[in-house]
Amino acid sequence: MPIAIYQGHHHSLAPADINIVIDVIRAFTVAHYAFIGGAKEILLVRTADEAFALKDTYPDYVLTGEEKGVGISGFDLDNSPKRMAGQNMTDKSLIQKTTNGVTAALGALNAKHLFVTGFSNAKTTAQHVKKLVANDCVINIVASHPSGDDDMACAEYIKGIIEGTNVVTAAEAIERIKGSSVAEKFFDCRQPLFDSEDIVYCTKELTGDFVMKVKQDGEVPTIERVII
């Protein structure tokens, strides 16, 4: 059961049985909290222009995401899990555009199963994948940030659970996420656009009954909440 870890959001992945794309800080933590809040689905797009075009067609859809880490003018929400956790998303469809996680997911569609996750849903996702796999399964894990240890720590944590080696513990992953270069700006009082409480949400492991799987048979790849 070969499991490869890739870092960054621009890969040409060979066909695989399972791809897992990680964005801890913050895209797929935001997505996780959106589904906890009742969201129906999350459409993934590469650009703000694509997001606005979809919004024109579906005015009730909620735009969420970022460019260069900050919220996009004209979007309904930014990329903050703290803010998402305070929203009622019952039966809402979202459109998400982010620099790393969404871009990486859209580059990882060449798989029978594509899952996305942050750390908050990493254990649940890994345990679900472990039940799916056979000895000859090809699995790719994509740590979507090009250099940050946050996504890499989560990738190694997930890989260890699937393999049964548990080489990285949850506590170790949390410390690496908090200590990563990506997290630094959230603790910098000179950068008020980045809220340190977001890192609390990004490092809280939740027990859940669903995974986030990307549905690929429509015009726009869409994350769905799949009960396990």
UniProtKB/Swiss-Prot annotation:
PANTHER family: 2-PHOSPHOSULFOLACTATE PHOSPHATASE-RELATED
Protein encoded by which gene: comB
Family membership: Belongs to the ComB family.
Keyword match Magnesium: yes
Reactions catalysed, as given in the entry: (2R)-O-phospho-3-sulfolactate + H2O = (2R)-3-sulfolactate + phosphate
Species the sequence originates in: Bacillus subtilis (strain 168)
Cofactor(s) the protein needs: Mg(2+)
EC number: 3.1.3.71
Record keyword Cell membrane present: no
Keywords: Hydrolase, Magnesium
Source taxon at top rank: Bacteria
Protein name (record): Probable 2-phosphosulfolactate phosphatase
Upper lineage: Bacteria, Bacillati, Bacillota, Bacilli, Bacillales
A GO term, aspect molecular function: sulfopyruvate decarboxylase activity
A Pfam family per the record: 2-ph_phosp
